[in-house]
């Protein structure tokens, strides 16, 4: 109240012209509202690289550490992988921050599916030796230039995220991130590596298959862009006998519990264990979704023409 009274007293002491001008200024200020926060700067590959490998030289002063990391980066064979990893991080940084996942945590789980050399053994793997000179400073020497074998197939942002998720990335609610990376607008975030000498397994589909084996409800939810509480998800999981995962009826925001279609009785040994489904079986399941009716095709019913 004291603030309001002060404003009123100020207005009472103003002339008509000054009062009108003051009201206009205040109105413009209110219309502008709170200034928008500037967009966060995107993390580039070198920033991620430096963040990850800097701890290898924690015993060195900053004036030595920076040029060493710059030299290593210039000769690092994984520039495209680092740029890609950090581009994906920048795209989902806000969602990751909401779940307390930092850049360091993201990198920790992303280096493995991208085939990037880990901190442990990095110098040896790429043929580098750090030598201490007589004056106490340090210099880099490269004793060998190894033949790097690329194990990575082309991957998009969703494929990398699924691989990190399967590797243990601590995300308790991945649905929003999966939905965002499934948007065609983010499909440009992709990587095309050199043709690998040894075929890799960390493409998008293999990452999705692994997620489906661990959490079929979440996998179907991300595939069909529906909340994992939607009755359709329980129908799809239940129809194909994923009993070990869906043990309780799904509630749909006040609607009656979803009824899973009745199935023939099987012994515990005969029940289909989703973790043992091979890729051909999973592919067959994924093709059972009818996009025209937004429902699953019951494989036991004859289909009309």
Curated annotation (Swiss-Prot):
Which GO cellular component term is one of those annotated? Answer: nucleus
Q: Where in the cell?
A: Nucleus
Q: Name one GO molecular function term.
A: DNA binding, bending
| DNA-binding region (UniProt annotation) | 38-93
Keywords of the record:
DNA-binding, Fertilization, Nucleus, Transcription, Transcription regulation
Pfam families (alphabetical) = MATalpha_HMGbox
Q: Which GO terms describe its biological process?
A: positive regulation of mating-type specific transcription, DNA-templated; single fertilization
Domain of life, per lineage: Eukaryota
The entry sums up its family as follows: Belongs to the MATALPHA1 family.
Describe its function: Controls fertilization, probably by determining the mating type. May be involved in the post-fertilization steps of the sexual cycle besides mat+. It is required for the developmental events that occur in the female organ after fertilization.
This protein's name: Mat- sexual cell fertilization-promoting factor
Organism listed in the record: Podospora anserina
Its lineage opens with:
Eukaryota, Fungi, Dikarya, Ascomycota, Pezizomycotina
């Amino acid at each position: 109240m004291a603030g309001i009274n002060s404003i009123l007293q100020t207005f009472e002491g103003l002339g008509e012209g000054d009062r009108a001008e003051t009201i206009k200024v205040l109105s413009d200020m209110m219309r502008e509202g709170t200034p928008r926060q500037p967009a966060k700067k995107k993390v580039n590959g070198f920033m991620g690289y430096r963040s990850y490998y800097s701890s290898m030289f924690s015993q060195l002063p900053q004036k030595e550490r920076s040029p060493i990391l710059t030299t290593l980066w210039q000769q690092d064979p994984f520039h495209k992988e680092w740029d890609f990893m950090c581009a994906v991080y920048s795209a989902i940084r806000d969602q990751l921050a909401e779940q307390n996942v930092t850049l360091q945590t993201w990198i920790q789980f992303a280096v493995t599916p991208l085939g990037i050399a880990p901190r442990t053994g990095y110098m040896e793997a790429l043929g580098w030796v750090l030598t201490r000179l007589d004056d106490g400073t340090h210099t880099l020497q490269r004793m060998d230039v190894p033949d790097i074998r690329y194990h990575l197939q082309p991957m998009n942002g969703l494929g990398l995220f699924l691989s990190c998720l399967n590797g243990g990335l601590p995300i308790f609610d991945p649905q929003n991130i999966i939905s965002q990376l499934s948007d065609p607008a983010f499909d440009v975030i992709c990587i095309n590596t050199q043709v690998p000498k040894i075929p890799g397994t960390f493409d998008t589909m293999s990452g999705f298959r692994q997620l489906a084996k661990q959490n079929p409800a979440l996998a179907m939810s991300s595939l069909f862009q529906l909340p994992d509480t939607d009755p359709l998800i329980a129908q799809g999981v239940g129809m194909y006998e994923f009993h070990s995962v869906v043990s309780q009826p799904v509630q749909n925001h006040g609607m009656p519990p979803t009824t899973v279609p009745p199935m023939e009785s099987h012994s515990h040994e005969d029940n289909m264990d989703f973790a043992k489904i091979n890729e051909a079986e999973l592919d067959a399941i994924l093709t059972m979704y009818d996009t025209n009716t937004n429902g699953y095709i019951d494989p036991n019913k004859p289909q009309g023409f």
